[in-house]
C-alpha cells in the first residue's frame, strides 16, 4: 500500500498546489546574494494561503513589543489585458472578455533594498513593475514596455516595465510591484511576514507564541531549509505546458481559451480509472503509474466509480480551498489528477 501511495503522489505533487505551496515561499534563500537582510537574524512566518488579519495584527503587536522590524510579502493573480511598446503600439492583446493571468508579488518599497539590488529597489519606488525572465520570454516583453493590467478589484492600470530579472531573484513569481501599486491593483493579502533583528533570542519566539493565537503556522529561523514541496511555479508551468487566456465564470470556475484547450486537452480510456480528460503530456506518466498499480495487484485500492463522479484531471478553475489570491489550479492545465477524493479508500491522491 505504501508503494502505491508514494508512486501516484509523485505524479500529482509535482504540479499540484499544496497548502503551503506558493511562489516566493523561499524568499530569504533566493535573495542571499544581495547586501541587506543576510546581515540580520531573520524569522519568517507563513500559513496556508494567506496570513489571517488577526495573525498579521498579532505579529505587529509582537514586533512592537520586541523592538524588531517586520515587513509583509503580498501575492495575488492579476489580469494582463494588453502590452504596449515604447511607441504605444500594441504588441499583445487578448480576446474580448479574456485575460492572461500573472502571479504578482508585492513588497514594501522602503524595505526592498534589503532583498533586491539598489536598481530594482529604486524602480519599485518609481512605481514600475519588475518582470521575470521566463515571463518576458512568454509574452515577448522588454524593459520600457507598458502592461495594461486588470486588478483583483477590476481596476485597470498601466505600468511600465522597469527591469527584467532572473526568476530565482524575483522568488519565482511572474512580476513584482511595490505595496502601494499592489493596493491599487487590489492585492491586499499577505502570504508571509519577515521579521529581523540584530540578534534573535528565545524572547522573540516566546513573544510570538504568546500573542499569536492561531498555531497552524510555518515559522523558519536563520538558515532553516525551505519547504521542498516539488511544486512547479506558474512561470515554469507556462514554460512547459503553454499559457492560455481565461474568461471568468463565477469567481471559481473559468473558461480556458478554446484554441489552447483544443490543442492540449484530450479524453482517453485508461486502465483502472476509466475515461479521463487530461493534458496530452500526462498520458505516458499516468499510464505508467496505473500499469505499476496493476502489476503490484493494488488496483482494488482505487475507485473507478469515485474517480468518474468526484475525481478527475482537467478542471478549469481557481484554487478555492483557502484564500489563494485568484491562483489558477494546475487542473486548469490538465496536469493534476485526483483519485479517491471522497471515500474511505486509502490512499487519497
Kindly give the residue locations of the regions a language model identified.
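Second-shell loop/turn segments in exported
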Residues: 48, 125-126, 268-280, 325-326, ...
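Alpha-helical transmembrane segments
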Residues: 17-40
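Acidic helix-start/capping segments at beta-turn-to-alpha-helix junctions
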Residues: 302-320
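Short, surface-exposed glycine/acidic/tryptophan-bearing loops
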Residues: 315-343
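Basic-flanked hydrophobic alpha-helices used for secretion and membrane insertion
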Residues: 36-41, 51-70, 75-223
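Active-site acidic/histidine clusters and adjacent loop/turn architecture
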Residues: 236, 240-306
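Sec-dependent N-terminal signal peptides of Gram-positive bacterial secreted proteins and lipoproteins
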Residues: 4-20
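Sec/Tat-exported extracytoplasmic proteins
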Residues: 139, 151, 290-297, 343
Amino acid at each position: 500500500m505504501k508503494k502505491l501511495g508514494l508512486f501516484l503522489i509523485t505524479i500529482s505533487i509535482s504540479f499540484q498546489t499544496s497548502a503551503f505551496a506558493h511562489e516566493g515561499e523561499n524568499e530569504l534563500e533566493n535573495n542571499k546574494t544581495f547586501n541587506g537582510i543576510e546581515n540580520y537574524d531573520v524569522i519568517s512566518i507563513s500559513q496556508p494561503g494567506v496570513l489571517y488579519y488577526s495573525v498579521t495584527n498579532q505579529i505587529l503587536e509582537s514586533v512592537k513589543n520586541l523592538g524588531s522590524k517586520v515587513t509583509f510579502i503580498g501575492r495575488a493573480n492579476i489580469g494582463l489585458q494588453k502590452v504596449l511598446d515604447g511607441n504605444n503600439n500594441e504588441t499583445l492583446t487578448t480576446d474580448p472578455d479574456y485575460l492572461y493571468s500573472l502571479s504578482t508579488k508585492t513588497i514594501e518599497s522602503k524595505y526592498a533594498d534589503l532583498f533586491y539590488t539598489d536598481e530594482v529597489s529604486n524602480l519599485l519606488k518609481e512605481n514600475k513593475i519588475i518582470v521575470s525572465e521566463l515571463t518576458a520570454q512568454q509574452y515577448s516583453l522588454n524593459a520600457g514596455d507598458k502592461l495594461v493590467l486588470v486588478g483583483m478589484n477590476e481596476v485597470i492600470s498601466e505600468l511600465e516595465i522597469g527591469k527584467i530579472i532572473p526568476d530565482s531573484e524575483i522568488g519565482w513569481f511572474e512580476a513584482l510591484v511595490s505595496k502601494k501599486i499592489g493596493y491599487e491593483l487590489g492585492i491586499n493579502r499577505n502570504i508571509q511576514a519577515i521579521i529581523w533583528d540584530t540578534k534573535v533570542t528565545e524572547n522573540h519566539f516566546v513573544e510570538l507564541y504568546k500573542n499569536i493565537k492561531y498555531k497552524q503556522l510555518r515559522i523558519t529561523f536563520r538558515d532553516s531549509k525551505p519547504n521542498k514541496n516539488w511544486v512547479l511555479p506558474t512561470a515554469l508551468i507556462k514554460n512547459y505546458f503553454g499559457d492560455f487566456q481565461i474568461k471568468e465564470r463565477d469567481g471559481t470556475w473559468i473558461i480556458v481559451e478554446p484554441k489552447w484547450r483544443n490543442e492540449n486537452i484530450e479524453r482517453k480510456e485508461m486502465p483502472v480509472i476509466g475515461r479521463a480528460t487530461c493534458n496530452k503530456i500526462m498520458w505516458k506518466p499516468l499510464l505508467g503509474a496505473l500499469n505499476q498499480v496493476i502489476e503490484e495487484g493494488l488496483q482494488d485500492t482505487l475507485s473507478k466509480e469515485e474517480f468518474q463522479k468526484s475525481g478527475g484531471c482537467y478542471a478549469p478553475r481557481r484554487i478555492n480551498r483557502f484564500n489563494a489570491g485568484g491562483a489558477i489550479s494546475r487542473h486548469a492545465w490538465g496536469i493534476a489528477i485526483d483519485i479517491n477524493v471522497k471515500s474511505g479508500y486509502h490512499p487519497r491522491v
